[in-house]
């Protein structure tokens, strides 16, 4: 199995210094997510035409698909200040008050991992999002009073990998709720070629496609693999990345040809072997592999479905013939099934 961090969509420490230089700054330069981009483009243009703050936006989807990049692009397109923070950083009401009290007119305020806000901090955010005011408690005990401070109108952008953990009251305060889906191979190939150009690395089409196929539909992983392949090309080849160099480097890193990790394989093998291909409920799968059902639904399933290994049905999850072939599992007959002429 490959290093889990290598094919994880979560941001790693080493990613930060590279991502800043590789991120597109305009919506037109952002590859993929065409429907989402159209919705954002309309909202941005409408806000500019009216001279107003854009509606609050909630972006959700698996990690590494570009939620933070899109938030910074929105600020760039609106030509306003961009203030980022994250749910875990806002530990106290005072932390949020300090940011909100300094927000300027039409500014973009970005909260990553918004599902991790503490309840009392989240409640304080409600009035800011809906009424553009901050309620501050002054004093203690019976003499304590609440003061409401007006705020300039601004745009809040929340990002989450776990939309199901965002409370309904918070979710309802966002005018736009948009999902990012895993990218297809052609989109990822274009991203790899663009990143290679910015890194001044020569790469052939076949090599870019090889990386694109193995990055789990995730640009962050694609860029991470590109850096590893670049290292291999410089040390073991002539610095140029052709398909053979890419294949050799990725095989050396134990990156599966579809970029599957241990959890992906556990999910599929549980369905294929333990439950004879399904249908089986997501809660049952979650209990079998000691994983949260929301994580399976929001992080792992989208990619497995995109690959054609898994189908969602009203009765549960069902493995496809492609999954049986790829994982080399022989289909087991259920009670009452009859073998075909070729299985008899």
UniProtKB/Swiss-Prot annotation:
<dbReference type="InterPro" id="IPR003593">
    <property type="entry name" value="AAA+_ATPase"/>
</dbReference>
<dbReference type="GO" id="GO:0016887">
    <property type="term" value="F:ATP hydrolysis activity"/>
</dbReference>
<feature type="binding site">
    <location>
        <position position="312"/>
    </location>
    <ligand>
        <name>DNA</name>
    </ligand>
</feature>
<keyword id="KW-0378">Hydrolase</keyword>
<protein>
    <recommendedName>
        <fullName>Holliday junction branch migration complex subunit RuvB</fullName>
        <ecNumber>3.6.4.-</ecNumber>
    </recommendedName>
</protein>
<feature type="binding site">
    <location>
        <position position="68"/>
    </location>
    <ligand>
        <name>Mg(2+)</name>
    </ligand>
</feature>
<feature type="region of interest" description="Small ATPAse domain (RuvB-S)">
    <location>
        <begin position="184"/>
        <end position="254"/>
    </location>
</feature>
<feature type="binding site">
    <location>
        <position position="220"/>
    </location>
    <ligand>
        <name>ATP</name>
    </ligand>
</feature>
<feature type="binding site">
    <location>
        <position position="67"/>
    </location>
    <ligand>
        <name>ATP</name>
    </ligand>
</feature>
<comment type="subunit">
    <text>Homohexamer. Forms an RuvA(8)-RuvB(12)-Holliday junction (HJ) complex. HJ DNA is sandwiched between 2 RuvA tetramers; dsDNA enters through RuvA and exits via RuvB. An RuvB hexamer assembles on each DNA strand where it exits the tetramer. Each RuvB hexamer is contacted by two RuvA subunits (via domain III) on 2 adjacent RuvB subunits; this complex drives branch migration. In the full resolvosome a probable DNA-RuvA(4)-RuvB(12)-RuvC(2) complex forms which resolves the HJ.</text>
</comment>
<dbReference type="InterPro" id="IPR008823">
    <property type="entry name" value="RuvB_C"/>
</dbReference>
<dbReference type="Pfam" id="PF17864">
    <property type="entry name" value="AAA_lid_4"/>
</dbReference>
<feature type="binding site">
    <location>
        <position position="183"/>
    </location>
    <ligand>
        <name>ATP</name>
    </ligand>
</feature>
<dbReference type="GO" id="GO:0006310">
    <property type="term" value="P:DNA recombination"/>
</dbReference>
<feature type="binding site">
    <location>
        <position position="317"/>
    </location>
    <ligand>
        <name>DNA</name>
    </ligand>
</feature>
<dbReference type="GO" id="GO:0048476">
    <property type="term" value="C:Holliday junction resolvase complex"/>
</dbReference>
<feature type="binding site">
    <location>
        <position position="23"/>
    </location>
    <ligand>
        <name>ATP</name>
    </ligand>
</feature>
<dbReference type="Pfam" id="PF05491">
    <property type="entry name" value="RuvB_C"/>
</dbReference>
<keyword id="KW-0547">Nucleotide-binding</keyword>
<feature type="binding site">
    <location>
        <position position="173"/>
    </location>
    <ligand>
        <name>ATP</name>
    </ligand>
</feature>
<feature type="binding site">
    <location>
        <position position="68"/>
    </location>
    <ligand>
        <name>ATP</name>
    </ligand>
</feature>
<dbReference type="InterPro" id="IPR041445">
    <property type="entry name" value="AAA_lid_4"/>
</dbReference>
<dbReference type="InterPro" id="IPR004605">
    <property type="entry name" value="DNA_helicase_Holl-junc_RuvB"/>
</dbReference>
<dbReference type="InterPro" id="IPR036388">
    <property type="entry name" value="WH-like_DNA-bd_sf"/>
</dbReference>
<dbReference type="GO" id="GO:0005524">
    <property type="term" value="F:ATP binding"/>
</dbReference>
<keyword id="KW-0234">DNA repair</keyword>
<dbReference type="InterPro" id="IPR036390">
    <property type="entry name" value="WH_DNA-bd_sf"/>
</dbReference>
<dbReference type="InterPro" id="IPR008824">
    <property type="entry name" value="RuvB-like_N"/>
</dbReference>
<dbReference type="InterPro" id="IPR027417">
    <property type="entry name" value="P-loop_NTPase"/>
</dbReference>
<feature type="binding site">
    <location>
        <begin position="130"/>
        <end position="132"/>
    </location>
    <ligand>
        <name>ATP</name>
    </ligand>
</feature>
<feature type="region of interest" description="Head domain (RuvB-H)">
    <location>
        <begin position="257"/>
        <end position="344"/>
    </location>
</feature>
<comment type="function">
    <text>The RuvA-RuvB-RuvC complex processes Holliday junction (HJ) DNA during genetic recombination and DNA repair, while the RuvA-RuvB complex plays an important role in the rescue of blocked DNA replication forks via replication fork reversal (RFR). RuvA specifically binds to HJ cruciform DNA, conferring on it an open structure. The RuvB hexamer acts as an ATP-dependent pump, pulling dsDNA into and through the RuvAB complex. RuvB forms 2 homohexamers on either side of HJ DNA bound by 1 or 2 RuvA tetramers; 4 subunits per hexamer contact DNA at a time.</text>
</comment>
<keyword id="KW-0233">DNA recombination</keyword>
<keyword id="KW-0227">DNA damage</keyword>
<dbReference type="GO" id="GO:0006281">
    <property type="term" value="P:DNA repair"/>
</dbReference>
<dbReference type="GO" id="GO:0009378">
    <property type="term" value="F:four-way junction helicase activity"/>
</dbReference>
<keyword id="KW-0067">ATP-binding</keyword>
<comment type="similarity">
    <text>Belongs to the RuvB family.</text>
</comment>
<dbReference type="GO" id="GO:0005737">
    <property type="term" value="C:cytoplasm"/>
</dbReference>
<keyword id="KW-0963">Cytoplasm</keyword>
<feature type="binding site">
    <location>
        <position position="69"/>
    </location>
    <ligand>
        <name>ATP</name>
    </ligand>
</feature>
<dbReference type="Pfam" id="PF05496">
    <property type="entry name" value="RuvB_N"/>
</dbReference>
């Amino acid at each position: 199995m490959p290093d889990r961090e290598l094919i994880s969509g979560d941001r790693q420490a080493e990613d930060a210094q590279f991502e800043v230089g590789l991120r597109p700054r305009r919506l037109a330069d952002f590859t993929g997510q065409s429907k989402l981009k159209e919705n954002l483009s309309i909202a941005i243009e409408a806000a500019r035409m009216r001279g107003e703050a854009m509606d609050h936006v909630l972006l959700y989807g698996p990690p590494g698909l570009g939620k933070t990049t899109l938030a910074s692009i929105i600020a760039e397109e609106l030509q306003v200040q961009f203030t980022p923070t994250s749910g875990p950083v806002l530990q106290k009401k005072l932390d949020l008050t300090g940011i909100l009290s300094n927000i300027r007119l039409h500014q973009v305020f970005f909260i990553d991992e918004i599902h991790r806000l503490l309840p009392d901090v989240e409640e304080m955010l409600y009035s800011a999002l809906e009424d553009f005011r901050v309620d501050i408690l002054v004093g203690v005990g019976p003499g304590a009073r609440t003061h409401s401070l007006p705020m300039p109108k601004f745009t809040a952008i929340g990002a989450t990998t776990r939309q199901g953990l965002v409370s309904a009251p918070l979710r309802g305060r966002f005018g736009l709720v948009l999902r990012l889906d895993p990218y297809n191979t052609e989109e990822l190939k274009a991203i790899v070629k663009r990143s290679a150009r910015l890194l001044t690395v020569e790469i052939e089409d076949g090599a870019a496609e090889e990386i694109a196929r193995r990055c789990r539909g995730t640009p962050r992983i694609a860029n991470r693999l590109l850096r590893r392949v670049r290292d291999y090309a410089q040390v073991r080849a002539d610095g140029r990345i052709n398909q053979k160099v890419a294949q050799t480097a990725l095989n050396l890193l134990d990156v599966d040809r579809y970029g599957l990790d241990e959890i992906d394989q556990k999910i599929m093998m549980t369905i294929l072997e333990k439950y004879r291909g399904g249908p089986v409920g997501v809660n049952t799968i979650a209990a079998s592999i000691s994983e949260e059902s929301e994580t399976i639904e929001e992080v792992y399933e989208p990619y497995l479905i995109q690959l054609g290994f898994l189908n969602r049905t009203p009765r549960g999850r069902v493995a496809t013939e492609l999954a049986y072939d790829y994982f080399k599992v022989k289909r087991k007959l259920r009670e009452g099934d009859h073998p075909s002429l070729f299985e008899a």
